[in-house]
């Protein structure tokens, strides 16, 4: 059961007990082979999506968000208090997770205990859209406690300039170890019709740990800058070439965990056309540290293009080739990677929408030319909107590295906003042998692996909104 109560005209309390927090749409497949950093999956559950913009802190690069509610896997209850009083906007989120994943390699048995999440956030409005803010988070999980606190700000000295910064400190105790770490980031931006400039510096201690957040790594200090100049070939909206923008991106840093320096230089040209068209041509080169070694990274050439070709068709695509790293934990090596991606949105009428995306990645060992992997991921989504209430959606996804296909069929009827009924059916297929023997068992040559259904599911989900 869920409810919403307006305490005052500006303060609202949302609560839920034993909710069905299952998603009605599967996460999109991504290439997972040879990824150094974790993949980010956005929140799709309504309770956590509503009003969560408040909990974001100022313009981080390494930290995607300070409160990533996908960390709360299976909530027993949730409560959220949000509101505005004068110039102060605040929010408090509290939830108990029934099946959390353990952090700190303490063992799978800890995953059976509940984990309590508590987040407090407040911002104070200054002039225009400037603000100063603070955040406090606390998680408790079977003897392990993680605490984080800090502040952030955004100020705009002029219409073309902005300065943003944040500082966080964390402390983690699991009964045997007590660790503490800090993180800080400062960003300056300048943007006019002619020039665009960004400079950012950030630092993360090796022992920085914020359980509620999503960030890529810790234990590094780095700085980067992006500079772009815009040229407008001809005034007016009818000329096909709207803007030409040469740009350069440069980054330096030191990774204390991987024990090495890093640098990266990317430069190129960006063209903007009518019909939301754009074309990029870039080249980049850099060094990246991994397990005490420094490897070459970058792209000899990278191309990207996209356009709203006609009213009912939008497409995009890109490709690049260059040096890369095979991120093996024992024996990493230098390689070369060829990658490409493409997609389109087709909407021939007001009812039908077809989305398609594809990603392909190939990696070869540089010293021998040996092919290490060749991966393709395809995602297709077809939606038919019969009217403003009723839709049917079919989603199919394919991952060649995992040899699996996922299909989802969903029918959804929304009576009024907040009152909706879902019915869905999903299947997961994986390629393998159907004789029951291990995959590496010796078999006759004519026996081939086939895709077989590993999981099927049928679900019904309804929500009802009652206003008092």
Residue ranges and their predicted role:
Residues 74, 168-173, 177-468:
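Exposed, low-structure sequence patches enriched in small/polar residues
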Residues 1-242, 251, 255, 283-288, ...:
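Outer-membrane beta-barrel channel domains
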